[in-house]
Amino acid sequence: MIIPWQDIAPETLENLIKEFVLREGTDYGDVEVSLQNKIDQVKHQLASGEVSIVFSELHETVDIQVTKRF
């Protein structure tokens, strides 16, 4: 189930994105990217519709996934 990111409290959204970024451990190449920069990138992707927040009823978990998968 897709959860509209606009319906999530700002502090909760920030923590959700932070947990996602830290869990993913994405390699940004030779350039070091700050945690806040990574969080801002995910926020931009949410606003543009590139990614969505997804709740799994089966596993009772929340994740951020590429919107095209749905």
UniProtKB/Swiss-Prot annotation:
Pfam families: UPF0270. It comes from the Bacteria. InterPro entries: UPF0270 (IPR010648), YehU-like_sf (IPR036685). Belongs to the UPF0270 family. NCBIfam families: PRK04966.1 (NF003438). This is UPF0270 protein VS_2853. It comes from Vibrio atlanticus (strain LGP32).
